[in-house]
């Protein structure tokens, strides 16, 4: 129970409070971009990760609600949902588990931090000004 609450506090409540405090300036400026980092686990679920999946699914709900609330003020809110990304954490995983996970990805590889960052940068740009309330799964096709 404590682990569940800690994961929700970090991944959902943390985003809520960040949005709450940054929105004041966005509203004042009549412009803003909010990009939440969710996960394909929040879209698909994953055995053994009920706490994380719940928090990330909740973040998607928060994203969509905030997008509706703030759209009239020229503030967009979207979420990026990374799939399997090459990080120090994934590098520490046993090779067999890593290979099994990558085998589920239609593109046949893990994503990179740069690919996630480029997606976030796009959503922050003027080119994404007509995109709000969306979840962009950057997952090599895993969630399709």
Which stretches of residues belong to each language-model region?
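Active-site loop immediately N-terminal to the catalytic Tyr-X3-Lys motif
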Residues: 44-50, 72-73, 108, 126
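Substrate-binding pocket helix/loop in short-chain dehydrogenase/reductase
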Residues: 3-8, 90, 101
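A short helix-coil junction within the Rossmann-fold of NAD(P)-dependent oxidoreductases
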Residues: 21-33, 73
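Residue(s) in the substrate-gating loop at a strand-loop-helix junction
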Residues: 39
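Alpha-helical segment proximal to the catalytic Tyr-Lys
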Residues: 24, 68-72, 129
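C-terminal helical subdomain
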Residues: 79, 102-127, 131, 138-140
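Active-site helix of classical SDR
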Residues: 19, 55, 63
């Amino acid at each position: 129970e404590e682990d569940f609450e800690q994961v929700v506090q970090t991944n959902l409540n943390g985003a809520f409070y960040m949005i709450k405090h940054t929105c004041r300036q966005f509203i004042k400026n009549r412009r803003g971009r909010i990009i939440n980092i969710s996960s394909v686990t929040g879209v698909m679920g994953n055995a053994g990760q009920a706490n994380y999946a719940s928090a990330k699914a909740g973040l998607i709900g928060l994203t969509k609600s905030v997008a509706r609330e703030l759209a009239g003020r020229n503030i967009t809110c979207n979420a990026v949902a990374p799939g399997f990304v090459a990080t120090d954490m994934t590098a520490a995983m046993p090779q067999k588990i890593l290979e099994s996970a990558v085998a589920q990805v239609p593109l046949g590889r893990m994503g990179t931090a740069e690919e996630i960052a480029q997606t976030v940068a796009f959503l922050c740009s003027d080119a994404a000004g007509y995109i709000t309330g969306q979840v962009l799964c950057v997952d090599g096709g895993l969630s399709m």
